Every structure is written in structure tokens, then in C-alpha cells.
UniProtKB/Swiss-Prot annotation:
Its cofactor is Zn(2+). Keywords: Cell inner membrane, Cell membrane, Hydrolase, Membrane, Metal-binding, Metalloprotease, Protease, Transmembrane, Transmembrane helix, Zinc. It comes from Burkholderia mallei (strain ATCC 23344). Zn(2+) binds at H131, H135, E202. The gene is htpX. Belongs to the peptidase M48B family. Binds 1 zinc ion per subunit. It comes from the Bacteria. This is Protease HtpX homolog. GO terms for molecular function: metalloendopeptidase activity; zinc ion binding.
């Protein structure tokens, strides 16, 4: 429940930030235009982002004939989660990783790299796919798409303010210092909120995935193994399209940074600790 409340508050914050920046650029008319642009971008992302991401990663759809064990595993977990059977994809990449996409449970897809199938045991793989199906069940793909779109739009509006300035309610030019401050700080604030949303949804998918599989320890073991392997194996497509990193079960990008604030995923150690606590207590709330 806490993660859902936190997500709702963060979504409200990123929307408010977007509208406020629009207002600073063009007053009440700017706020209205900014909101309409955001709605249009979210609509496009909602309908087409899954196709774009799967094509971007050159994901190949598989079925029971081409990947029988993997396909049956997903089907069994989808049944346990009371979800429609998603489309199943494989990505020919060495880094162990996986993600879910699709605008709703009826149009969902799950994808895994060939690397993750080589590295994980069947039990660990069940934990990973249960995590991805939890994202589908919670409609996290929609949430992450909206937050990413809004963060990108905030950055675009901030750049507009930097180069063209803004107007107040009476149409007079806005304070140029304020415009520069907005241009510098707003994209950072938008990105921080987006990443906080992503971290909250990962925790919730860990909890939901453990509930679907009934085996939180399997997911904990999988996360530990993925973390150790992924850090030493580059994922070129993800590096070229870093905005898609938040979709993965583990951050696929190399490099460091301010771990707690500028990460799309919670610390692996904290995720494992929470899962092991679920395994010990049998509680998933």
C-alpha cells in the first residue's frame, strides 16, 4: 500500500511540475498548452511504446514449439496471477535481464535475454518472470511510460524557456534569471521524480512477483546472480537507449553516479533483504 501511495504522490508531483513550467513560459495559456501536449504524448506512448521497444531490442516472439520450457513457465505463472497469456519474446543478448511491456494486461508482452536463460536456474527464472507479470498486473508499464514522457516533456519545456524566455499573465517577458533557473533545475527535478517512481514500482513488483510465484527466495537468489553477472557484461542497445533502462528487472547500464537519487532501480541489497524477510515471515504486505 505504501508504494502505491508514494507512486500516486510522485505522479502528481511530476504532473504539477510540468504544468507549472508551462505556466512560467506562457501564463495560464502556457499551462493549458503544456497539459494538452502532455496528454498527446502520453496517448502516443500508451498505444505504441511496446512495439517501439520490442523492435528497438530486436526481440523475437517465441511460442511453445520454439521455446517450450520458457513459454510453459510464463503460461503457468500467468494462470496463477489470473492474467491473460502475454506474448513471449527472447532477445539475443549476453547480459542477463528481462522486462515487461504493453499498454494493459490484454496487450502485454514479456521479454528475456538469452543470457538470463543461461545464467539462472528454472526456479530463479520463475521468480524473475513472476516479477515481470506483477508489473503487468499492476499496470506499471503505463505508469512508467507516463512518468518518462512527462520527464522528457519537462526537459523540452525547460530548453524552450532557456532559448526563448517566457511570459507572465499579462504577456510581459518573464524574469530571465528565473528562466535560466527553471531551465537548469526543472529537468533534474523531473528526472529525480521519474526515477523515484521507477524505484517504488520495482519494490512493488518484487512483492507482487513473490506472491505470484509463492517463492520470494527464488527471486532474491535471481537478483543476486543477475547483479553479479550484469555488471560485467555490456548491453549495447540499452546503452544507446538509456530511457528504457527503467523497464528492466536490473539496471542494464554501466557506470556509477549518485546511487540513491539517480538510479532507476532500488539497491539490489535492499531488494534482496525485503524478499528474504518475506520468505522468513510468509507475509507479502
Amino acid at each position: 500500500m505504501f508504494n502505491w501511495v508514494k507512486t500516486a504522490m510522485l505522479m502528481a508531483a511530476i504532473t504539477a511540475l510540468f504544468i507549472v513550467i508551462g505556466g512560467m513560459i506562457g501564463g495560464s495559456r502556457g499551462m493549458t498548452i503544456a497539459l494538452l501536449i502532455a496528454l498527446g504524448m502520453n496517448f502516443f506512448s500508451y498505444w505504441f511504446s511496446d512495439k517501439m521497444v520490442l523492435r528497438m531490442y530486436n526481440a523475437q516472439e517465441v511460442d511453445e514449439a520454439t521455446a517450450p520450457q520458457f513459454y510453459r513457465m510464463v503460461r503457468e505463472l500467468a494462470t496463477r496471477a489470473n492474467l491473460p497469456m502475454p506474448r513471449v519474446y527472447l532477445i539475443d543478448e549476453n547480459q542477463p535481464n528481462a522486462f515487461a511491456t504493453g499498454r494493459n494486461p490484454e496487450h502485454a508482452a514479456v521479454a528475456a535475454t538469452t543470457g538470463i536463460l543461461r545464467v539462472l536456474s528454472e526456479r530463479e527464472m520463475r521468480g524473475v518472470m513472476a516479477h515481470e507479470l506483477a508489473h503487468v498486473k499492476h499496470r506499471d508499464i503505463l505508469i512508467s511510460t507516463i512518468s518518462a514522457t512527462m520527464a522528457g516533456a519537462i526537459s523540452a519545456l525547460a530548453n524552450f524557456a532557456m532559448f526563448f524566455g517566457g511570459r507572465d499573465e499579462n504577456g510581459r517577458p518573464a524574469n530571465p534569471i528565473a528562466g535560466i533557473a527553471v531551465a537548469l533545475l526543472a529537468p533534474i527535478a523531473g528526472a529525480l521524480i521519474q526515477m523515484a517512481i521507477s524505484r517504488a514500482r520495482e519494490f512493488e513488483a518484487d512483492r507482487g512477483g513473490a506472491q505470484i510465484s509463492g517463492d520470494p527466495q527464488a527471486l532474491a537468489s535471481a537478483l543476486d546472480k543477475i547483479h553479479r553477472y550484469a555488471s560485467g557484461i555490456p548491453f549495447q542497445t540499452a546503452e544507446e537507449h538509456p530511457a528504457t533502462a527503467q523497464m528492466m528487472i536490473m539496471n542494464p547500464l554501466s557506470g556509477g553516479g549518485l546511487q540513491n537519487l539517480f538510479s532507476t532501480h532500488p539497491a539490489t541489497e535492499e531488494r534482496i533483504a525485503r524478499l528474504m524477510d518475506m520468505a522468513r515471515t510468509g507475509r507479502f504486505d
